[in-house]
């Protein structure tokens, strides 16, 4: 038994020694894949090393991360402001509306009619306005006649010659005014002659009575006549002097009153004439506003159904004139938060809603105008209006140019500058940190 154990131990020793001597000369593939699973860790790694794929994958990911970091620091991206809008004609479509309330007298155009600037589109009934204008013209003519008649009367009073209305046209109205003026002047002359005749009579009688009174004064000193007789003659003289002064005062009053009446009539006539001229201008302007004309060359669109006698309210849109041959542009609405970065001349990229921009491309443009204040749309939202000029008014669709049409929906991407990618990535974090660190 002992012998057998010694032989077994010797045999295992020889095998181990032989294996140790052959340990560096072991051929590849000594163990099959199943056997390697049961080898010690060192022998298992030595027999089947780890694949380098994971190591290279990690290296590639680290290189990509480093490249992305460098690109975010060095690379820049454009800052774009988005504004939705539509295609409009240059100069805008002109909305035609009545500025006065009235009734339709005649419609002179139809939908899609071509019109030139100044063509009459629609007439409103001007009967009431014309009647009012005629009334004021009559009053103005009457006031001018009164003014001319007053000036002629004043000249006649200054010169003593009969008044003549030479400054008015020779028409029945002038003849009637001249006749009325002649009658006025004749009445004045009749009163004046009557007073002057009385003055002349009083002067003659006064001269005679004065001589008699002076004679009685001498006779009284000599004692030939009584004191009473002298006083009677002196009283008669003083009575005639009083009547003479009264007549002269009547003549002066007549002249003053006639002149004052002429001046008052002149002032009133000028005032009435000025008022009538203002009313004539007002009614004439009102009558002209009842005729609606085309402001530009174009095509009539969106004509409201109108018939003769239809009531039209002031500012009610009746039709639209789309300018022809004026080109197109983009009108977009810009949010208030973006207005601080948009300036006239900024480049813009326009995407047309009717055509997929990823397939048919975009249009380049430039900002022409930015409204100085916000405008309010139908939804009571405030926004700024931006006008963009297009470099080309057409897109290449299936090899053919397609012109844009008025009213097409578009989106304008307005380029306002550039920034580094790292700023874009870190700005939300910085903003959040700046806002949150100061909170209570």
Curated annotation (Swiss-Prot):
Q: Which organism is it from?
A: Bordetella pertussis (strain Tohama I / ATCC BAA-589 / NCTC 13251)
Offer a single GO CC term for the protein.
plasma membrane
Specify the protein name: Protein CyaD
Residues assigned to the Cytoplasmic compartment are: 1-55
* Transmembrane parts of this sequence: 56-75
Pfam families linked to this entry:
HlyD_3 (PF13437)
Q: Which NCBIfam families match?
A: type_I_hlyD
Q: What gene does this protein come from? A: cyaD
* Cell compartments where the protein resides: Cell inner membrane
All ranges on the Periplasmic side of the membrane: 76-440
PROSITE patterns membership: HLYD_FAMILY
What is the annotated role of this protein in its UniProt record? CyaD is necessary for transport of calmodulin-sensitive adenylate cyclase-hemolysin (cyclolysin).
């Amino acid at each position: 038994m002992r012998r057998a154990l010694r032989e077994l131990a010797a045999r295992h020793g020889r095998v181990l020694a032989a294996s140790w001597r052959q340990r560096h000369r072991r051929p590849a593939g000594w163990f099959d894949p199943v056997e390697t699973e049961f080898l010690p860790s060192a022998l298992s790694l030595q027999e089947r090393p780890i694949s380098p794929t994971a190591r290279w994958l990690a290296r590639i990911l680290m290189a990509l991360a480093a490249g992305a970091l460098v690109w975010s620091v060095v690379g820049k991206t454009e800052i774009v402001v988005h504004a939705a809008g539509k295609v409009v004609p240059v100069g805008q479509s002109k909305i035609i509306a009545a500025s006065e309330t009235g009734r339709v007298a005649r419609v002179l155009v139809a939908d899609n009619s071509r019109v030139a600037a100044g063509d009459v589109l629609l007439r409103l009934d001007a009967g009431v306005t014309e009647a009012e204008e005629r009334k004021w013209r009559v009053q103005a003519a009457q006031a001018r006649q009164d003014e001319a008649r007053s000036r002629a009367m004043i000249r006649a009073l200054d010169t003593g010659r009969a008044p003549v209305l030479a400054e008015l046209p020779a028409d029945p109205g002038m003849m009637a005014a001249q006749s009325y003026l002649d009658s006025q002047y004749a009445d004045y002359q009749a009163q004046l002659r009557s007073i002057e005749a009385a003055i002349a009579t009083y002067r003659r009688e006064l001269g005679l009575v004065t001589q008699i009174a002076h004679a009685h004064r001498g006779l009284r000193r000599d004692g030939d006549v009584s004191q009473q007789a002298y006083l009677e003659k002196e009283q008669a003289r003083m009575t005639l002097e009083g009547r003479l002064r009264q007549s002269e005062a009547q003549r002066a009053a007549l002249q003053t009153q006639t002149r004052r009446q002429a001046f008052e009539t002149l002032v009133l006539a000028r005032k009435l004439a000025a008022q009538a001229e203002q009313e004539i201008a007002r009614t004439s302007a009102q009558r002209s506003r009842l005729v609606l004309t085309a402001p530009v060359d174009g095509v009539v669109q969106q004509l409201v159904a109108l018939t003769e006698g239809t009531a039209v309210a002031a500012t009610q849109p009746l039709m639209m004139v789309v300018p022809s041959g004026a080109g197109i542009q983009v009108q977009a609405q810009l949010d208030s938060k973006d207005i601080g970065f948009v300036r006239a001349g900024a480049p813009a990229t326009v995407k047309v809603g009717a055509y997929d921009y990823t397939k048919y491309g975009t249009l380049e443009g430039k900002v022409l105008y930015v409204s100085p204040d916000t405008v309010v749309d139908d939804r009571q939202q405030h926004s700024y209006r931006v006008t963009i000029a297009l470099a080309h008014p057409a897109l290449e669709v299936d090899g053919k140019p397609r012109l844009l049409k008025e009213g097409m929906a578009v989106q304008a991407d307005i380029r306002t500058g550039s920034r580094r990618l790292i700023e874009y990535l870190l700005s939300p974090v910085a903003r959040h940190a700046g806002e949150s660190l100061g909170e209570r």
